[in-house]
Amino acid sequence: GLTAAKKLGMEFYDKELIDAAAKEIGFPAEIIADREQRLTNSLLYNFAMGTLYGLSYPKEPKLSELPLTEQIYVAQKKAIEEAAKRGSCVFIGRCADYILRSRPDVLRVFVYADRDIRLRRAIDEYGDLEEHIDEFMHQTDKRRRIYYENYTNQRWGDRENYDLMLNSGDLGIEKCVELICQAVK
């Protein structure tokens, strides 16, 4: 994502959305980041209680009246929409493909790879033990899937949600960046 953004001369947003949410909500970014990492259980709880954003509120609540997990989503959604209005940019995750789905100028990309390839890349980058990284990847994918599916009512990684899906295991990262840049132009 960052490499494609640099090559295209676009702004890049990933963890920056945590800072934007923190500013909007009035919580320290560290708390938002920590809560974002633990969203799975909170989302499951909220879902079970019927309190996910927009599902059971009789009127549009104030941001401060929402559970913190929903405040984070709403604040990040606002940051994504505002950044997209300012100009071309690249977002990593946080349902940006769904949030911006009605805009005709959006290219929705999903980059994936087989588990073994992702595991090898992570070990090369982080140098941790395979079993630790494998479990971390499993938990991260689970959190992403639950987050995406709860806020979009769509399946995470489903081809219908994206304009371009690239297997970085087969293509390599540089080729994926090249194809994304070509698709944007």
Question: Which positions does each model-derived feature cover?
Answer:
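ATP-dependent NMP and nucleoside kinases share a basic, alpha-helical "lid"
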Residues: A75-Y126
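Short glycine/serine/threonine/alanine-rich loop segments
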Residues: K6-M10, F27, D128
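Glycine-rich phosphate-binding P-loop
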Residues: G1-A5
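Short, amphipathic alpha-helical "lid/cap" segments that border enzyme active or binding sites
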Residues: K77, I173-C181
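ATP-dependent small-molecule kinase phosphotransfer cores
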Residues: A22-S88
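Short beta-strand-centered segment that lines the nucleotide-binding/catalytic pocket of NTP-utilizing
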Residues: L8-A22
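Small-molecule kinase domains that catalyze NTP-dependent phosphoryl transfer to phosphate-bearing small molecules
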Residues: R38-F47, L52-Y53, L129-E174
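Conserved beta-strand scaffold positions in the cores of enzyme catalytic domains, especially
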Residues: F12, V106-R108, D163-M165
